[in-house]
């Protein structure tokens, strides 16, 4: 320690001496820089700088984290537009049988239509090939027209028609029916008579008729001679069996 202090004192004296001598002589030109001194001690920490600009995004991202817990349900949204109708589904199974209905009131046969007629030939008019039965015996609800020989249906349903006609000759008759706008239908009956005796030709049928349909008896022009007298009568009858549903 004492050696260092002595060395420092010697240096100070030498510098002073040189300075004094230098004042007495002419100034010499500047010399070259000396050797760099020993680095000084670190200074005190400076003040905190301002915040820098955000850096560019990194090239690689981190590992994807685990799925988080489900959040709370949001409020209901507004109703959407009505969609197009879907395709028709398959036919469902039959449902159980319903309960038995209440028994209805008893029907009154007096309130039901009961068309029926019977007519015989007495003094019939000539009406082509139509066989006219001019004398009416029964004509319930007036379905039979004795001037034309036609039955006109007013109550749709199933009817029975029959005839018994007297003749001494060969005879062919038909029960003819006709619907409005439809071709007529006929059902023929024939009988031969070689002895010239009274003989009955009979026929009958059941027909389903609609309102406005007509039924009559028609003769064959070549075999249509009917007995006309007081000894026997020819008759044409018909009636409703039951109405259509």
Curated annotation (Swiss-Prot):
Q: How is its activity regulated?
A: The C1Q subcomplex is inhibited by sulfated molecules, such as triterpenoid sulfates, heparan sulfate, or chondroitin sulfates.
Binding positions (Ca(2+))? 199
All disulfide bonds of the chain are 172-190
Q: What PTM annotation applies here?
A: O-linked glycans are assumed to be the Glc-Gal disaccharides typically found as secondary modifications of hydroxylated lysines in collagen-like domains.
Alphabetically ordered keywords of this record: Calcium, Collagen, Complement pathway, Disulfide bond, Glycoprotein, Hydroxylation, Immunity, Innate immunity, Metal-binding, Repeat, Secreted, Signal
TM ranges: none
Residues found modified as 5-hydroxylysine: 48, 67, 100
Q: Which GO terms describe its biological process?
A: astrocyte activation; complement activation, classical pathway; complement-mediated synapse pruning; innate immune response; microglial cell activation; neuron remodeling; response to iron ion; synapse organization
Tell me the protein's name: Complement C1q subcomponent subunit A
**What is this protein's gene name?**
C1qa
Where is the signal peptide, in residue numbers? 1-22
* Domain named C1q: residues: 110-245
Q: Which part of the chain is the Collagen-like domain? A: 31-109
Organism's domain of life? Eukaryota
Give all 4-hydroxyproline modified positions: 39, 45, 54, 79, 85
């Amino acid at each position: 320690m004492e050696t260092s202090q002595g060395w420092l004192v010697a240096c100070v004296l030498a510098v002073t001496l040189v300075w004094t001598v230098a004042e007495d002589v002419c100034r010499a030109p500047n010399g070259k820089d000396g050797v760099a001194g020993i680095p000084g001690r670190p200074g005190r920490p400076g003040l905190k700088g301002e915040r820098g600009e955000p850096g560019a995004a990194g090239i690689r991202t981190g590992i994807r984290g685990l799925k988080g817990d489900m959040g709370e349900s949001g409020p209901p949204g507004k109703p959407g537009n009505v969609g197009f109708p879907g395709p028709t589904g398959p036919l469902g199974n039959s449902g159980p049988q319903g309960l038995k209905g209440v028994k209805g009131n008893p029907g009154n046969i007096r309130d039901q239509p009961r068309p029926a007629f019977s007519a015989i030939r007495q003094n019939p008019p000539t009406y082509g090939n139509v066989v006219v039965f001019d004398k009416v015996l029964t004509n319930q609800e007036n379905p039979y027209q004795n001037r034309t020989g036609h039955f006109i249906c007013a109550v749709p349903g199933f009817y029975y028609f029959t005839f018994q006609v007297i003749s001494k000759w060969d005879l062919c008759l038909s029960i003819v029916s006709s619907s409005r706008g439809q071709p007529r239908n006929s059902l023929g009956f024939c009988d031969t008579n070689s002895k010239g005796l009274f003989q009955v030709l009979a026929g009958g049928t059941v027909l389903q008729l609609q309102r406005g349909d007509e039924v009559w008896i028609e003769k064959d022009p070549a075999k249509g001679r009917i007995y006309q007298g007081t000894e026997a009568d020819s008759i044409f009858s018909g009636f409703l069996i039951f109405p259509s549903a």
